[in-house]
Swiss-Prot record:
Keyword match Isomerase: yes
Enzyme class: isomerase
Protein name: Lycopene beta-cyclase
GO cellular component: plasma membrane
Subcellular localization: Cell inner membrane
Inhibition and activation profile: Activity is increased in the presence of NAD(P)H. NADPH is not involved directly in the cyclization reaction, but must play an indirect role, e.g. as an allosteric activator.
Gene Ontology biological process: carotenoid biosynthetic process
One Pfam family matching this protein: Lycopene_cycl
Gene3D superfamilies from the UniProt entry: FAD/NAD(P)-binding domain
The entry's keywords: Carotenoid biosynthesis, Cell inner membrane, Cell membrane, FAD, Flavoprotein, Isomerase, Membrane, NAD, NADP
Length: 382
């Protein structure tokens, strides 16, 4: 089949959207098509990241997507409150969709269902077959038997308040709340003096979260903070995978076609944040000299395997969080972590821990029972 495009991106979410934008910047003559079954690119999400998660070059090229930026953020635990002087950034799916629409226009096909994805073609449900030199599947997380995961499940609501909330920076983790049989915290982003995004977040063993309970949790938390909720502007929900263990070779045997983002297992193993790795993949693909289905598949799988090798320590920490000690005491692990030096915490989020950092994290009295911690560390699959 004669290719209609150089690249077809199936799924117009974060990872594929960033690939498209970076390729357009670096290789403006490339013919790119994005296809998604949803009505709006990016869906209904808020993506956040820390300053040190990206290089200065990466900050520059994604700058048009950034809607909010704060110079610091807060965490709260039963016996620890702390402000961390690290920049925190936010991209909204609305801005993301606007930028993609402006840049790709007729080559952004929304409300378009795909029936079959192949290495060099896509068949739509309405029957049309479109050829390309390469295809990338970025349609979000798909369960894979090679990975054992927990989930960070959440419901977030954006509210307009009747009076100013008084927050000058995000509270990315408030674990002073009732734990409700797992590690639970509330996440709050101040979007304006009278607008807040409030997320009820749970680290749990499966992706299911009672939406009515989460909504009530948000209302209760707002009341406890003295925030007077006036108008619900938007609601989002999600379940980010948190990797406990797995087999990278078996994972990629189940992914014979090029894929991106959560589908490629490219997310921070402990936080579930996917934007930094999506930016890195976009950079890597935009630098390819040869652009074929084989070269793209090789570039993504090689990158993902590199990250898998680097993330073993994080997976061990995740097992301690999910498998060691009572579920309603998991907050102790995170409370202890946030007492560590600020530069170490920044490297943790960026996935760039040094050997000294790792030793520092494990030193001292463990926040969970020693035997349970050792059993969790030795667990390779649930």
């Amino acid at each position: 089949m004669q290719p209609h495009y150089d690249l077809i991106l199936v799924g117009a979410g974060l990872a594929n959207g960033l690939i498209a934008l970076r390729l357009q910047q670096q290789q403006p003559d490339m013919r790119i098509l994005l296809i998604d079954a949803a009505p709006q690119a990016g869906g209904n999400h808020t993506w956040s990241f820390h300053h040190d998660d990206l290089t200065e070059s990466q900050h520059r090229w994604i700058a048009p997507l950034v809607v909010h930026h704060w110079p610091d953020y807060q965490v709260r635990f039963p016996t620890r409150r702390r402000k961390l002087n690290s920049g925190y950034f936010c991209i909204t799916s609305q801005r993301f969709a606007e930028v993609l629409q402006r840049q790709f226009g007729p080559h952004l096909w929304m409300d378009t269902a795909v029936a079959e994805v192949n290495a060099e073609s896509v068949r739509l449900k309405k029957g049309q077959v479109i050829g390309a030199r390469a295809v990338i599947d970025g349609r979000g997380y798909a369960a894979n038997s090679a990975l054992s995961v927990g989930f960070q499940a959440f419901i977030g609501q954006e509210w307009r308040l009747s009076h100013p909330h008084g927050l000058s920076s995000p509270i990315i983790m408030d674990a002073t709340v009732d734990q409700q049989n797992g590690y639970r915290f509330v996440y709050s982003l101040p979007l304006s003096p009278t607008r807040l995004l409030i997320e009820d977040t749970h680290y749990i063993d499966n992706a299911t979260l009672d939406p009515e309970c989460a909504r009530q949790n948000i209302c209760d938390y707002a009341a406890q903070q003295g925030w007077q909720l006036q108008t619900l502007l938007r609601e989002e929900q999600g379940a980010l995978p948190i990797t406990l263990s797995g087999n990278a070779d078996a994972f990629w045997q189940q992914r014979p076609l090029a894929c991106s983002g959560l589908r490629a297992g490219l997310f921070h193993p402990t936080t579930g944040y996917s934007l930094p790795l999506a930016v890195a993949v976009a950079d890597r693909l935009s630098a390819l000299d040869v652009f074929t289905s084989a070269s793209i598949h090789h570039a993504i799988t090689h990158f993902a395997r590199e990250r898998w090798q680097q993330q073993g320590f994080f997976r061990m920490l995740n097992r301690m969080l999910f498998l060691a000690g009572p579920a309603d005491s998991r907050w102790r692990v995170m409370q202890r972590f946030y007492g560590l030096p600020e530069d170490l915490i920044a490297r943790f989020y960026a996935g760039k821990l040094t050997l000294t950092d790792r030793l520092r994290i494990l030193s001292g009295k463990p926040p969970v029972p020693v035997l349970a911690a050792l059993q969790a560390i030795m667990t390779t699959h649930r």
